[in-house]
A protein has these predicted regions:
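Conserved beta-strand
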Residues: 6-9, 16-26, 33, 57
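Walker A (P-loop) phosphate-binding loop of ABC-type ATPase nucleotide-binding domains
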Residues: 35-40
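Helix-to-loop junction immediately C-terminal to a conserved catalytic motif
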Residues: 49
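Conserved ABC transporter NBD signature motif
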Residues: 57-68, 72-73
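ABC-family P-loop ATPase nucleotide-binding domains
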Residues: 75, 81-138
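Catalytic Walker B motif of ABC-type/P-loop ATPase nucleotide-binding domains
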Residues: 150-154
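C-terminal coupling/interaction segments
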Residues: 238-284
């Protein structure tokens, strides 16, 4: 069963449009959501969070739409963004009390355990927390709830490597029982390389590609060499050619590598390279 099902989603804004967005996340998986600034990532997330309504289409979390059961739908989602969403003046102990009142599934003991693990002071004003401390607090709140879908929107931006690595481990634990899933929107594509199971590319309001990460990485290769050594036929296989000091670099489909000889160097790509070359080619 899928935790998230988005079907034919459309939304028109003043100068932007989400068009026929479709995506699913199976239970127990992490989906990376990537695209350039303004591609439609946050707009899509706002619709899933029901911050605004779609013009047409449907969204279901664990089989439930907002129209079916608004309370259950909202309780099924946990969200961490790039800004701390706690009101100025609050302390950790205030956050705990508020969450107990709002979420029936909130686990106070787990929250206390995470606050201790993250070494967060319970009586210090949150406004005086560092960026890393605020992010840890937000993660402590969502990890202490029984939400089916965790949405991360640039949540790991600006974190030091130690904190980021710690949180990557926590995210994998979050889904390990196979009953929860994560939608992870980030510009830190190295994070997705580490933990994502699926990758979704969005550009100009359209979902361009949604595939298992490992499958996608196998389907493409990076090719490098002297552009002058290419035949006209070989040039047709290149995706998003970039000129470098040593020659050229481009993306090709792996099954086209047989059409090149030993004058060229082939490397396995990462998610960032696939995205950048396909954008340059105009395929996204």
């Amino acid at each position: 069963m899928n935790i998230l099902e988005v079907r034919n989603l459309n939304k028109t804004y003043k100068d932007f449009q989400l068009k026929h967005v479709n995506r699913t996340i199976p239970k127990g998986y992490i989906m990376g959501f990537v695209g350039q600034n303004g591609a439609g990532k946050t707009s899509t997330i706002n619709l899933i969070n029901h911050i605004c309504k779609c013009d047409s289409g449907s969204i279901k979390i664990d089989g439930i739409s907002y129209a079916d059961d608004p309370v259950r739908y909202k309780e099924s989602i946990a969200y961490v963004g790039d800004e701390c969403y706690f009101t100025k003046g609050l302390k950790v102990k205030n956050v705990k009390q508020t969450l107990k009142e709002f979420y029936p599934t909130f686990d106070s003991e787990k929250f206390d355990s995470l606050i201790e693990k993250y070494n967060l002071p319970i009586n210090k004003n949150i406004i005086n927390f560092s960026r890393g401390m605020k992010v840890k607090l937000m993660f402590a709140t969502v990890f202490s709830r029984d939400a089916k879908l965790l949405i991360l929107d640039e949540a790991t931006n600006g974190l030091d490597p130690v904190v980021r690595e710690e949180l990557m481990g926590e995210l994998q634990k979050y889904i390990e029982k196979g009953e929860r899933s994560i939608l992870f929107s980030t510009h830190m594509l190295s994070d997705l390389e580490e933990i994502a199971d699926y990758i979704t590319f969005i550009d100009n309001g359209r979902i361009i590609l949604q595939k298992p990460k490992d499958e996608m990485l196998e389907e493409y290769m990076i090719i490098k060499g002297d552009y002058g050594n290419l035949t006209e036929q070989q040039k047709k296989y290149l995706i998003g050619v970039e000129n470098k000091n040593y020659g050229f670099e481009a993306l090709i489909e792996s099954n086209n590598a047989q059409n090149f000889d030993g004058q060229f160097v082939f490397e396995k790509p990462n998610v960032s390279q696939i995205m950048l070359h396909t954008i340059k080619e105009g395929r996204m």
